[in-house]
């Protein structure tokens, strides 16, 4: 972590099919062992499946799903006088999106469908309808922050 100057954020180019940076970022999160084309196939297939079921633009479905997963608050550990408190803090906009994407992919992989495409499509549709494990994770995160509201004055 350099002290002299702010490190420039790497720019992610929009994906080739939808021309959207959010989709490109999600492809990068899904990707394993550098197999980007496999990750793209899985995500594009999932978005097509989702758009067939809802009859809406695939990118709109994805963005609404991510909006339903994004956490507004989270807790961070803060040590004060020998005891550790879970202090609720607001989540930065960039982190909200990346957490939402990570949770979406994580809980999609935990699903019981056969293919990755089906798993992703299922989790995207569940998030779109405010259901599913990723949305539950957001709710749990918010509950945790709400429960520890008394320690909010320890924010830094």
UniProtKB/Swiss-Prot annotation:
It holds the Pfam family Ribosomal_S7. GO terms for molecular function: rRNA binding; structural constituent of ribosome; tRNA binding. Keywords: Ribonucleoprotein, Ribosomal protein, RNA-binding, rRNA-binding, tRNA-binding. CDD domains: uS7_Bacteria (cd14869). It comes from Geotalea uraniireducens (strain Rf4). This is Small ribosomal subunit protein uS7. GO terms for biological process: translation. SUPFAM superfamilies: Ribosomal protein S7 (SSF47973). It comes from the Bacteria. Part of the 30S ribosomal subunit. Contacts proteins S9 and S11. One of its GO terms (cellular component) is small ribosomal subunit. Transmembrane segments: none annotated. One of the primary rRNA binding proteins, it binds directly to 16S rRNA where it nucleates assembly of the head domain of the 30S subunit. Is located at the subunit interface close to the decoding center, probably blocks exit of the E-site tRNA.
